[in-house]
A protein has these predicted regions:
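Long, hydrophobic N-terminal alpha-helical segment
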Residues: 2-51, 56
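Ordered, amphipathic secondary-structure segments that act as subunit-interaction surfaces
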Residues: 60-105
């Protein structure tokens, strides 16, 4: 199945995302794609604490995400992707990954 929902949000995983969007997505896994977060153990640990109970979480670099999606690693998963930059999603779509629904966080407004 792959990605069921993607969200661009500079805060990535926080209360509203964990309590509202994650459940709404129907995903089995939250995937945070961000080089800075993936390489910072303290930030990764705090993101893992924020994940909803019962959902798997992956916090990976952009390169790892691209390689894993190319290899079909998530074909049998439902994934809710969180990114800070739209360019990350553009790169995923350029390799053929489908993003059926996108939420863009702009300040406190949702687009």
């Amino acid at each position: 199945m792959g990605i069921v929902l993607a969200r661009i949000d500079n805060r990535l995983l926080h209360g509203i995302v964990a309590t509202q969007w994650a459940g709404r997505s129907g995903a089995q896994r939250i995937m945070i794609i961000d080089d800075t977060v993936a390489n910072n153990e303290l930030t990764k640990a705090s993101m893992k604490l924020a994940r909803p109970t019962g959902m798997a979480i992956s916090i990976i670099t952009e390169e790892t995400a691209l390689n894993n999606f190319k290899a079909g690693k998530y074909n049998d998963h439902t994934v809710f992707v969180l990114v800070k930059k739209p360019e990350t999603l553009v790169k995923l779509t350029e390799i053929g990954v489908k993003v059926p629904e996108l939420v863009v966080e702009i300040g406190r407004a949702h687009v």
